[in-house]
Amino acid sequence: KPTDRKEAFQMLKAISGKTHRVVTGYSIQGPGISLVDADIADVTFRNLEDWEIEFYVKSGSALDKAGAYGIQDFIGMVGIEKLEGSFYTVMGLPIYKVYQALKPFILEGRDLIMSYEL
């Protein structure tokens, strides 16, 4: 995460017109499961104009984001040219992979609930 607006601007300028890799790790711990994994997405930004970066940075959104941007924010919507991988991985939680890991436990719980008689 950037420490100030100047650093946020520099970070966004550095990825402008380039592809960068986002790696999001997660851990699931509990009875019957101990999993540590990660997912990868490649994000390509078009060449951003300085005024677009300044507009986004001045909104304050860049300061609380890893990489100084949120894929769901203005700069992500208008600046990302290509995404290879999961949108949610870039947001910070690879939902699909987490769901697949938890699915057996969800099904187990569902079967318990469905077998309960009122």
Model-assigned labels for residue ranges:
Residues 1-118:
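Anionic-ligand binding patches
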